[in-house]
C-alpha cells in the first residue's frame, strides 16, 4: 500500500503546469488537446498516469516535445534559457479539462 502512495507522490511532480499560449489555445480548440509543461525526466506513460490521477479524465494519447533553450545575452555575458519539455495530451471523446477559475 505504501508503494502505491509513493508512486502517486512521484506522479504529482510530473506536471509542472499548463502552457497558456496562442498555439496551445489553437491546438486545444482544433484538436481537443491540452498542453502541459512537464518534468525533463518524464515519459509518455508518466504524463498519462499523472493527468488521469489529477484531473480524473481518460487520456487517449500523449505526444512529447523537447524544446531547446534559446541563447541569450545579458550585457557582455552569454548564456541560454533552460531546456524544457512539453506534453500534448489528447483526451478521449467527451472528456474535458478546464483551467478557468470559477467564482462562488
Curated annotation (Swiss-Prot):
Pfam families: Ribosomal_L23. Keywords: Ribonucleoprotein, Ribosomal protein, RNA-binding, rRNA-binding. SUPFAM superfamilies: Ribosomal proteins S24e, L23 and L15e. Gene3D superfamilies: 3.30.70.330. GO terms for biological process: translation. GO terms for molecular function: rRNA binding; structural constituent of ribosome. One of its GO terms (cellular component) is ribonucleoprotein complex. It comes from the Bacteria. Belongs to the universal ribosomal protein uL23 family. Part of the 50S ribosomal subunit. Contacts protein L29, and trigger factor when it is bound to the ribosome. One of the early assembly proteins it binds 23S rRNA. One of the proteins that surrounds the polypeptide exit tunnel on the outside of the ribosome. Forms the main docking site for trigger factor binding to the ribosome. PANTHER family: 60S RIBOSOMAL PROTEIN L23A. This is Large ribosomal subunit protein uL23. It comes from Polynucleobacter necessarius subsp. necessarius (strain STIR1). The lineage of its organism: Bacteria, Pseudomonadati, Pseudomonadota, Betaproteobacteria, Burkholderiales.
